[in-house]
């Protein structure tokens, strides 16, 4: 039986917008196991990104609990939450969020430096990750010199290089054409299989559903569907 990484217990999130309250999540309960490859699916405003933010410790629920390996994020200080993100989670964003003045190599190296590691100790690890995402011939280029698909490959490598237990991918294919979207999804599927990091997508892209092994559908802040399945076979 797989280890449970994330547990949500009756989680709700309410935002105040002017004088009105907006309920982004309403009584959501679910678990995420180690090595999961899954997605939160739903239209804009359904609560997908809010759910990722709560799991990532970027926001706190209004009511309910978010637990990581049994420890409540609610009880963590800001410093502890920062350490939780730094040590356990890799983030992949729709807009890549690469540092424009850094090369491919330097962008992937950066989270390891934040974790207090010396470049001389991790250079081989970074170069291996660059090779894994097929960018060795671009290793010294800056983000402005790369295509959208290449930038997202850098973001994937940056998320994985610190060997996280969980990767949160917020609309990672939204800015890519169909061919690049499938390439990125196949790559993430292969890396999930190899590195065993759980991956959670937030998406409204139906292409993602071909690859994932579990789909959690959200409507109006509630879970309306939670289905496990066999994803597309990994190409060899």
Whereabouts are the PLM-identified features?
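ABC-family P-loop ATPase nucleotide-binding domain
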Residues: 1-14, 225-236
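H-loop (His-switch) and adjacent beta-strand-loop-beta switch element
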Residues: 215-228
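ABC family nucleotide-binding domain
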Residues: 4-211, 215-218
């Amino acid at each position: 039986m797989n280890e449970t990484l994330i547990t949500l217990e009756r989680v709700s999130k309410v935002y105040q917008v002017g004088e009105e309250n907006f309920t982004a999540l309403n009584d959501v309960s679910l678990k995420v196991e180690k090595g999961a490859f899954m997605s939160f699916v739903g239209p804009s405003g359904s609560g997908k990104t809010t759910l990722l933010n709560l799991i990532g410790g970027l926001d706190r629920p209004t009511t309910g609990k978010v637990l990581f390996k049994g420890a409540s994020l609610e009880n963590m200080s800001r410093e502890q939450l920062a350490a939780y993100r730094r040590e356990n989670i890799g983030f992949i964003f729709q807009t890549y969020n690469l540092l424009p003045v850094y090369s491919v190599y330097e962008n992937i190296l950066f989270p390891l430096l934040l974790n207090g590691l010396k470049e001389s100790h991790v250079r081989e690890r970074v170069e291996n990750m660059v090779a894994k995402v097929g960018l060795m011939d671009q290793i010294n280029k800056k983000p402005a010199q790369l295509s959208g698909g290449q930038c997202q490959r850098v973001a994937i490598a940056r998320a994985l290089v610190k060997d996280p237990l969980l990767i949160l991918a917020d609309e990672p294919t939204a800015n890519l054409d169909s061919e690049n979207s499938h390439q990125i999804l196949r790559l993430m599927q292969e890396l999930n299989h190899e590195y065993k990091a759980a991956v959670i997508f937030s998406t409204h892209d139906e292409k993602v559903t071909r690859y994932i092994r579990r789909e959690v559908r959200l409507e109006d802040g509630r879970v309306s569907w939670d289905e496990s399945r066999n994803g597309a076979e990994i190409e060899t």
